[in-house]
């Protein structure tokens, strides 16, 4: 196979997945008669923007496209609109809001809900209890892998303590229906094994076939809970810090106003969204000019996205000086034709690059100013020493308890307590009791359910809780054993951050992401099934061979086929950067796929509130 051919085939594969979803969505619009008003869930705006264009939707009867807002009353039905269509995530809150829309509409108007990814029984019960289930058409549309980058794909699930295995399994069925069975599949974790069993169950009536031109040679399936440590640590790669500080959403980022003050306002981020003049004007402003697309098409960001933040800043300053010199050279051009040629071809691009440089320099400096603060330096040190096992409990927990009263440090407090719970196989009982008392005094006793939920989610727990749930201790021991096997925790060895030699650079040369080390070990030595079964358990290790090549053999990069790594439950940008370095070092194409990209704050908040709906409205 000629170089580059496999890459084209891979891109086309995932592009076809998107085309299938687009056709299904358009088919739904075609089958709904009359003119339509489309309401879109806020978290689905950007994913839908990558699937169907406004012109596609308007050609199929969509007259208006609106935000779906839980806080606002149903709008008056426009006389020109025959049907309202809602594209929403399935949850009870959205279902209850739909009930309000049905109750406000007249009998001759139709309402359709397209659930992404599937119709849930809880939503049906909400409709049924309100007596409106017969007035609503319900459809479901499974989200495909969306390309956030040429090597990074996401199902754009919302953060959840319970990953949606059904929609993930549907995606793998669609992938293999289009391009044949994946030859070799590895999996670690009970959810990974359950996921692949579900894939086989969904294919039972339509047996998948192998194809020689399948562009993916190996698939790695990982459970997020197998290694929660990268979520809890603060890394140092530029793209990862951008996500933690500002949030990258579907490949786009909204920089704060103070970082954009010297950047000209661009076009509407969603030019197909119509904002009613009666609606909140603030929402209108939020969609104007404050987003930047972050991908490899923008050369400057492509050069720094995976760099350590210090190396990124150094590169940006050097690049800015180089751009400025190129602009100043124009003053030495005497020939009018040459000067006109420079203005037409080079000047605009140079000014654009200079603007991007300035924006990223401002972002780098702002993030580094925070990271260099005494609190952050101490936190990095204590996290590292906790993982090494060299920190004293008194020093570690004194630092945490001093920050409990500081509301701005809530994420730091929860993440450090979670790290201690995992590493120490439960926080000492007296220390845990002291933490609970301080936390409730600061935030109020109505937050006691948050701590209960964090305990039930196995995020923060005391040693006494292990007696009631042995699986908590098993998870901690499994992580500790794998961490020792792959030597993921480093000492204080120096590393050139501008030219890193090891994946640990994403955490300041302190720790390598465990899941990435497992992929590296398989590339170097092959899959060690017996060892994984000994450490994790036979019921949590998956190996499937759909080829004559033995699964325990090392992947061969001479085949020009890709390795797909899928993390169920989300991946961090730290791990993405580490896998990209691994791909370069081993000369493999690695497709990084996931349910969503994790942000530490959302990860902790969701697990703190996961069961609180039981006590809520």
UniProtKB/Swiss-Prot annotation:
It holds the Pfam family Sec1. It is a peripheral membrane protein. Keywords: Cytoplasmic vesicle, Differentiation, Endosome, Lysosome, Membrane, Spermatogenesis. Broadly expressed in somatic tissues including the pharynx, intestine, spermatheca, and in coelomocytes. Expressed in the lining of the gut lumen. GO terms for cellular component: clathrin-coated vesicle; CORVET complex; early endosome membrane; late endosome membrane; lysosomal membrane; lysosome; recycling endosome. InterPro entries: Sec-1-like_dom1, Sec-1-like_dom3a, Sec1-like, Sec1-like_dom2, Sec1-like_sf, VPS33_dom3b. Disruption phenotype: Hermaphrodites exhibit sperm-specific sterility and only lay unfertilized eggs. In contrast to wild-type animals, mutant males produce no or few spermatids in their gonads, but instead their gonads accumulate terminally arrested spermatocytes that do not bud and contain four haploid nuclei. In some instances, the spermatocytes have small buds that do not form spermatids. Oocytes and unfertilized eggs contain some larger endocytic structures tethered to yolk granules. Its main location: other. GO terms for biological process: cell differentiation; intracellular protein transport; regulation of vacuole fusion, non-autophagic; spermatocyte division; vesicle tethering; vesicle-mediated transport. It is found in: Early endosome; Late endosome membrane; Lysosome membrane; Cytoplasmic vesicle, Clathrin-coated vesicle. Belongs to the STXBP/unc-18/SEC1 family. Probable core component of the class C core vacuole/endosome tethering (CORVET) complex. The common core is composed of the class C Vps proteins vps-11, vps-16 and vps-18, and which further associates with vps-8 and vps-33.2. Interacts with spe-39. Plays a role in vesicle-mediated protein trafficking to lysosomal compartments and in membrane docking/fusion reactions of late endosomes/lysosomes. Believed to act as a component of the putative CORVET endosomal tethering complex which is proposed to be involved in the rab-5-to-rab-7 endosome conversion probably implicating sand-1, and via binding SNAREs and SNARE complexes to mediate tethering and docking events during SNARE-mediated membrane fusion. The CORVET complex is proposed to function as a rab-5 effector to mediate early endosome fusion probably in specific endosome subpopulations. This is Vacuolar protein sorting-associated protein 33B. It comes from Caenorhabditis elegans. The lineage of its organism: Eukaryota, Metazoa, Ecdysozoa, Nematoda, Chromadorea.
């Amino acid at each position: 196979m000629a170089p580059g051919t496999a890459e084209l085939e891979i891109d086309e594969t995932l592009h076809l997945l998107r085309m299938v979803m687009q056709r299904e969505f358009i088919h739904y619009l075609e089958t709904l008669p009359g003119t339509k008003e489309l309401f879109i869930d806020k978290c689905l705006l950007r994913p839908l923007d990558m699937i169907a264009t406004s012109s596609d939707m308007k050609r199929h009867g969509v007259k208006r496209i609106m935000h779906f807002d839980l806080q606002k009353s149903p709008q008056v039905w426009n006389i020109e609109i025959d049907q309202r269509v809602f594209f929403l995530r399935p949850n009870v809150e959205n279902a209850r809001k739909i009930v309000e829309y049905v109750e406000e509409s007249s009998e001759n108007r139709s309402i359709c809900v397209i659930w992404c990814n599937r119709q849930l029984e809880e939503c049906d019960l909400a409709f049924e209890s309100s007596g409106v289930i017969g007035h609503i058409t319900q459809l479901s549309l499974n989200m495909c892998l969306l390309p956030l980058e040429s090597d990074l794909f996401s199902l754009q699930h919302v953060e959840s303590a319970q990953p949606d295995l059904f929609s993930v399994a549907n995606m793998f069925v669609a992938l293999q229906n289009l391009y044949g069975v994946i030859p070799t599949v590895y999996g670690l974790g009970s959810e990974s094994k359950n996921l692949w069993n579900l894939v086989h169950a969904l294919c039972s009536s339509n047996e998948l076939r192998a194809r020689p031109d399948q562009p993916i040679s190996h698939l790695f399936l990982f459970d997020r809970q197998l290694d929660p440590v990268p979520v809890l640590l603060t890394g140092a790669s530029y793209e990862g810090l951008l996500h933690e500080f500002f949030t990258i959403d579907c490949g786009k980022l909204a920089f704060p106003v103070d970082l954009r003050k010297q950047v000209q306002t661009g076009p509407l981020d969603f030019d197909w969204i119509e904002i009613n003049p009666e609606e909140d004007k603030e929402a209108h402003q939020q969609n104007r000019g404050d987003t930047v697309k972050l991908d490899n098409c923008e050369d400057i960001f492509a050069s720094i996205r995976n760099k350590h933040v210090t190396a990124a800043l150094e590169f940006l300053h050097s690049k800015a000086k180089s751009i400025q010199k190129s602009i100043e050279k124009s003053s030495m051009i005497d020939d009018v034709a040459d000067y006109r040629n420079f203005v037409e071809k080079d000047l605009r691009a140079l000014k654009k690059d200079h603007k991007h440089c300035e924006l990223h320099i401002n972002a780098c400096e702002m993030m580094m100013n925070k990271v260099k603060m005494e609190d952050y330096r101490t936190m990095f040190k204590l996290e590292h020493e906790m993982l090494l096992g060299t920190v004293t409990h008194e020093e570690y927990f004194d630092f945490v308890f001093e920050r409990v009263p500081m509301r701005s440090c809530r994420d730091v407090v929860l993440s450090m307590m979670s790290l201690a719970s995992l590493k120490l196989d439960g926080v000492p009982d007296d220390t845990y009791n002291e933490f609970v008392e301080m936390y409730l005094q600061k935030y109020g006793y109505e937050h006691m359910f948050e701590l209960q939920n964090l305990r039930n989610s196995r995020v923060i727990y005391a040693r006494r809780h292990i007696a009631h749930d042995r699986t908590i201790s098993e998870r901690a021991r499994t992580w500790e054993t794998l961490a020792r096997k792959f030597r993921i925790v480093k000492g204080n060895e120096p590393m050139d951050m501008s030219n890193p030699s090891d994946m640990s650079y994403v955490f300041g040369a302190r720790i390598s992401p465990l899941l990435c080390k497992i992929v590296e070990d398989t590339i170097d030595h092959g899959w060690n099934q017996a060892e994984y079964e000994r450490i994790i358990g036979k019921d949590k290790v998956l190996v499937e061979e759909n080829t004559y090549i033995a699964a325990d053999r090392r992947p061969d990069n001479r085949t020009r086929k890709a390795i797909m790594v899928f993390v169920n439950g989300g991946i961090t940008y730290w791990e993405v950067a580490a896998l990209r370095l691994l791909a370069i070092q081993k000369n493999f194409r690695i497709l990084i796929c996931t349910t969503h990209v994790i942000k530490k704050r959302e990860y902790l908040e969701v697990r703190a509130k996961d069961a609180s709906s039981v006590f809520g409205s």
